[in-house]
Amino acid sequence: MHRIGGGSVENLRLKARETTLNPSGISLLRAPSPEEAARQMREAFPAAEGLHEAAQVIGSTTVEKIRQAGFDVLPNPTKKLLNHYRLIHPEGVAGFHDVNLARLSAAFTETSGHAV
């Protein structure tokens, strides 16, 4: 499982729009490698320069590690990304607080240099 922009607490924090989703959560991609996740994101959104910039750093983890950190993942395919997942917390928005996010962040390994 891969998070565009890395696995830092700041990048795992819910954005305003993500708090309105049902259930609230952040995007992940299931891909064989961080490089592949970055490539898929760039191909799916060719004009999204901000996403392309963010995709230079990828946070990678496993479903097992996410669950050990107290979170979960749900399949959430989109028209452009069939391998899109949503990372959620059982307590919803309230579960995305700094203590939980620090535990979640520790489950990620970051790689960089995924060229634009």
Language-model features: locations:
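Short hydrophobic beta-strand segments
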Residues: 1-15
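Conserved NAD+-utilizing ADP-ribose enzyme module
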Residues: 10, 16-25, 32-116
